[in-house]
């Protein structure tokens, strides 16, 4: 089994468990897959990088959260969540905002 398979299975299982959620949630998961985010992130457990829900909780009260998360995705970051740096990800302009909004929506998971 590929090392990528298990995180992808976890993401898809979480999506199935939330099948009644709005279409935006499915769009977020598609973007996670498109940009291979599941290689280091899952919805609710640390996996190399922080979980998406931990990221959302961290930025929950930050009025600049959208811009900061977008900048971290595009430029990468290091040291904020542990020893592994996050490389920059070439997310398209049209995908960036929906991806960031989806991540930040996960404060209740």
Enumerate the predicted regions with their spans.
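Sec-dependent N-terminal signal peptides
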Residues: 5-14
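Sec-exported extracytoplasmic/periplasmic mature domains
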Residues: 33, 57-60, 74-78, 104-108
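Electrostatic cytochrome c docking/interface patches
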Residues: 16-32, 58
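Short microdomains enriched in Cys/His and/or Lys/Arg
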Residues: 58-69
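Axial heme c-ligation environment in periplasmic c-type cytochrome domains
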Residues: 50-57, 74-100
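The canonical Cys-X-X-Cys-His
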Residues: 34-43, 99
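N-terminal secretory signal peptides that target proteins for export/translocation
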Residues: 1-3
């Amino acid at each position: 089994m590929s090392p990528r398979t298990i995180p992808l299975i976890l993401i898809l299982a979480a999506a199935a468990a939330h099948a009644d959620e709005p279409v935006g949630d499915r769009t977020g998961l598609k973007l996670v897959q498109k940009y291979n985010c599941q290689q280091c992130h899952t919805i609710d457990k640390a996996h190399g990088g922080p979980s998406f829900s931990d990221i959302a909780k961290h930025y929950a009260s930050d009025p600049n959260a959208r811009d900061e998360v977008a900048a971290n995705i595009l430029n990468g970051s290091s040291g904020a969540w542990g020893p592994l740096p996050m490389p920059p990800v070439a997310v398209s302009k049209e995908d960036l905002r929906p991806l960031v909004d989806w991540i930040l929506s996960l404060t209740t998971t």
